[in-house]
Amino acid sequence: MKHVARGRTITLLLAVLVVCRPASAQIDLSGEWSVVRAEDNVGNTELGDWVGIPMNEASRLRSTAWDASIQTLPEWQCRPHGSAYISRGPSALKIWNEVDPVSRETTAWHLEWLRSVDRPVYMDGRPHPSPNAAHTWAGFSTGEWVGDMLRVRVTHLKEEYLKRNGVWHSDKIELTQYLIRRGDYLTYLVIAYDPVYLSEPLVRSTEYRLNVNQQIPPYPCTVVNEVDRPKGVVPHYLPGTNNDIGWFSRKYGIPMDVVTAGAANMYPEIRAKIPRSMGGSGPEPPPQPATQPRTQRPAPRAGQQ
């Protein structure tokens, strides 16, 4: 009888421990969030700004062919921003959770930005679909808690831009995202892996601040004829014809071989290639030869044109 009583006591204690175990460190991420601008997320990008992106040669060739006028095509005007880019734009963010009515557990988080689509993050452990499954602007997302951080894996994304200056990612991209809340601030960290256009992972982060007065409005979009151009014309540049690529380099005095260095320009050692007068530690460029003044063309004589 003593053994039976002892067994019952142990069973009861185990049951109490199970019932009274501390809840897993899950943070409430729901709310309306406004983007916080900082030095690493300043809004509109500039032509030829490839600094800080591990672009490979295929990515550089694709970027030099890009023409901003492609956004005026009817097929492009109402395209939503994809999951790899949207957090870098100016759009506000709304997060809410989906709760199982019986267990009261969160089965999915939903993330939606203005000018984007609802992106569910499934928390029920379901597997990602086949690589041949449909790819969408939002992709397919699953999440799990790592301490007090929500880690999200995103696959099945359509090909789209990483930056709105012609830097692209392929449909083979995979994202690892971390959502970290600290009071009224939310850090949104994105790590992008793309075997087609990136030579190594691209890491970017965005800060959001809770905004209780914010409400993301609907975003209806109507396709119109913005530019009168011949049917079938797609704006683009052929190789070697895009003179705007060097604009960023000329504006800020950054050598073009630094701008196009790919992964190398993400690390401090690249300063050795930047002249001291431009904030680096490298040698000054050789002086440019003096420009010869143009000879003034004589005025045409009477009867000449």
Pin down the residues of each PLM region.
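Coiled-coil-like amphipathic alpha-helices with heptad-repeat character
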Residues: 1-3, 16, 57, 296
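Short alpha-helical segments used as structural interaction elements across diverse proteins
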Residues: 3-5, 18, 85
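PEST-like low-complexity, intrinsically disordered acidic/proline/serine-rich tracts
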Residues: 24-305
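Bacterial N-terminal signal peptides
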Residues: 9-20
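Bacterial N-terminal signal peptides that target proteins for export
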Residues: 1-11
